[in-house]
Structures are given as C-alpha cells and as structure tokens.
Curated annotation (Swiss-Prot):
HAMAP family: Ribosomal_uL10 (MF_00362). GO terms for biological process: translation. The keyword Manganese does not apply. GO terms for cellular component: large ribosomal subunit. The gene is rplJ. It comes from Novosphingobium aromaticivorans (strain ATCC 700278 / DSM 12444 / CCUG 56034 / CIP 105152 / NBRC 16084 / F199). One of its GO terms (molecular function) is structural constituent of ribosome. This is Large ribosomal subunit protein uL10.
C-alpha cells in the first residue's frame, strides 16, 4: 500500500467515523470466505458499512472524531462496522456472532461513549430507529383516531334517532 492509498483509506475511514451513529469493532478469527461474505451482506442489508482496516490507519482516522476512545481496541485483526442508525451495525454483528464463533465482538462506541462487548450486545437488543419511529407514529395516530370516532359517534346516534322519528311519523 503506497502513501496515496493510505491517505485515501484514512480519509474514507474518517468519513465513516464522522457520519456514524455507532461503531462496532470486531475481530475475525479464521472466518471462511463464505462466512465473511454472509457477514458483509447482513451488515449491508442493515444499512451499515463493514471495513477491514489496518490498525495504524484506523487509529489515524479516528483522531479528531467522537470515536477517539476506540484507539485502544485496534489491536490484532480488527474490522469496523458502522451505521448512522445507532442500533443497526450492532444488531447485525451480534446476530451474525450467534451463528459462528469465528467472530469476536471487541467493543464499540456510540458517540463519545465507549462500549465493551456487553454494551454492544445491549445496544443490539434495543429497537432500531425505524422501529421507534413506527411505534411513535402509532402512538400519535391512536388518539387522533379515537377523537375522530368520538366526534362522529354522536352525529351517527343523532341521525338514527331522527330516522326513527321519521319512520314513526310516516
């Protein structure tokens, strides 16, 4: 890797760290190509990115971002999973880790808060941003629906009463 490629890699990783809502650091221990491809596919489907990077370049890229606390985690064969949704990357990595023992969750971070493996697993158990939005919209719509039902119910009852009087009179 020449100097320009290294600079390009650092710039790319810096962009990933700048846009990420959460970052998960993993250690791949003898994964097959098929497993690695499956992991990358699962992470991509979750809307996250997954990058195997040289530790020295990752340490340079993380400097000046909220994720500077991750510097100590970049030892050994590490990979970086990052997503704008704070839960997506963690959820994808934890779900994949359940299927194989070839991947180790080293830790992660959400903003400047550094997480250990248990913290990443706890983050993965939380609902995603889309799930929270759906729940919130459901909660907001429920009172409006009830109000609409209440405002139309008296009018419908009144119409039935008038209809009954009209039938009696006829």
């Amino acid at each position: 890797m020449d100097r320009s490629q290294k600079a390009e890699s650092v710039a790319f990783l810096n962009g990933v760290f700048a846009e990420a809502g959460a970052v998960v650091i993993t250690r791949n221990l003898g994964m097959t190509v098929a497993q690695s491809t499956a992991l990358r596919t699962k992470i991509r489907e979750a809307g996250a990115t997954y990058k195997v990077a040289k530790n020295s370049l990752a340490k340079l890229a993380v400097a000046g971002t909220d994720y500077e606390g991750l510097v100590d985690l970049f030892t050994g064969p590490t990979a970086i999973a990052a997503s704008a949704d704070p839960v997506a990357a963690a959820k994808a990595v934890v779900e994949f880790a359940k299927t194989t023992d070839k991947i180790e969750i080293v830790g992660g971070a959400m903003g400047s808060q550094v997480l250990n493996e248990a913290g990443v697993r706890a983050l993965a158990s939380m609902p995603s941003l889309d799930e929270l939005r759906g729940t919130l919209i459901g909660l907001i719509q429920a009172p409006a629906t009830k109000i609409a039902q209440l405002t139309t119910a008296p009018a419908a009852k009144l119409a039935r009463v008038f209809g009954a009087y009209a039938k009696e009179a006829a």
